[in-house]
Amino acid sequence: SESYLTAELDDGVVFQGFPDVGDRLLGVIGIQDKVDVFLIRHAYVRTLARRQGIGGQLLDHVTQDIDKPFLVGTWKAAIWAISFYEKHGFKDVGQQETERLLKTYWSIPTRQIETSVVLADDRWRAR
């Protein structure tokens, strides 16, 4: 919704889009600077444009010139999302670290923490 998008923008989430030939977006990614890390808060590709490398291009675009680590949180059941991030070098940080990171960088209910996973890029593991 427009109000949710406005709240995300007000919270510092910056969006990048992948346009089609016209003005229509095929994909979008939103990242948030949390001082010592960046969070991938949103990543979506239109159904008709999936499996064409758009998500990977968006991910590469937003991560390439930033030295800070990137973290992404998602549902444990979102196997497709976990597979996508693993394909692009992200790794599961484990349950204890997931809980700590979700409490530190995200504002989500306890139940969501229990059913989520955090994946981190190489910069996180190199710290």
Predicted regions and their residues:
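Conserved beta-strand in the GNAT
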Residues: V13, G17, R24-D33, V37-Y44
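Conserved GNAT acetyl-CoA-binding A-motif
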Residues: Q64-A77
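Short glycine/proline-centered loop/turn elements that form peptide/ligand docking sites
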Residues: G55, L59, A77-A81, E97-Y105
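Conserved acetyl-CoA-binding loop-helix of GNAT-fold acetyltransferases
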Residues: V45, R51-Q64, K87
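Conserved catalytic-core motifs of GNAT/GCN5-like acyltransferases
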Residues: L71-T74, K91-T110
